[in-house]
Design a protein with these regions (language model features):
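Cytosolic, long alpha-helical scaffolding segments
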Residues: 2-220
């Protein structure tokens, strides 16, 4: 579900706002969103690693993406109907949509793998996928621990390190494409698109980490 499809953090006039705190439901849903993002990352990594003989299908990846959309909608619906929230409303909305973006971009990269008829993934792509799995694992840990904030700061540090590593890897991957004078231009286009979709997933993970960092500071 792309940004904007989830709605707004503003409460529509027709929505009934509950004055009974349901703060624990936010933590449950964020934990579920993190788990779903990790499931997507692992599926996509396996699809790339085992391609073209992987038994992971694009339909399976899409199903996880759809499940993530449902969690995002549930979070925003809860946000729009609760007067009392565990932390800043804008941060809740941003975190929900950034986690959703992680899964969306992973699904896009997986889809391009099939659409472009890629015969064999490159080592760069497989390394990107491995970095994403590790980063999303830390994101899922942070989401699981939002309620008590235990271990969240270390997870954020680890994610930042992986994002820096991913940035360097993307530059190397693109350079390797343009360094070969005899490469088919179509191959350059295909892999540039796939590399950049994977990088967008990692960037969304970093943005989610930044939102969590703001939450930690505001609630210290």
């Amino acid at each position: 579900m792309r940004r904007g499809a989830t709605g707004s953090s503003r409460v529509p006039a027709a929505v009934r706002i509950s004055l009974t705190p349901k703060t624990s439901e936010f933590f449950v849903l964020f934990a579920r969103a993190g788990e779903n993002a990790l499931a997507a990352a692992r599926l996509v990594e396996r699809r790339f690693r085992e391609h073209p003989n992987s038994d992971v299908t694009q339909e399976q990846v899409k199903a996880v993406e759809t499940a993530g959309d449902t969690v995002t909608r549930d979070l925003i619906q809860l946000l729009n109907t609760q007067y009392v929230t565990p932390f800043d409303r804008d941060d809740i909305y941003l975190l929900a949509t950034e986690i959703d973006d992680v899964v969306d971009f992973l699904e896009e990269a997986s889809d391009l793998l099939g659409l472009y008829g890629v015969e064999m993934p490159t080592p760069h792509a497989m390394e990107q996928c491995a970095i994403i799995v590790e980063a999303v694992d830390h994101l899922a840990t942070a989401c699981q621990n939002l309620k008590g904030m235990r271990g969240v700061s270390q997870a954020l540090v680890d994610m930042k390190s992986l994002e820096d590593k991913g940035d360097r890897l993307l530059r190397d991957a693109l350079a390797s494409l343009f360094r070969d004078p005899g490469i088919d231009p179509l191959i350059v286009i295909r892999w540039k698109d796939i590399y950049e979709a994977l990088e967008r997933a990692l960037d969304a993970c970093e943005t989610a980490a930044n939102v969590i960092a703001n939450i930690v500071v505001k609630n210290a």
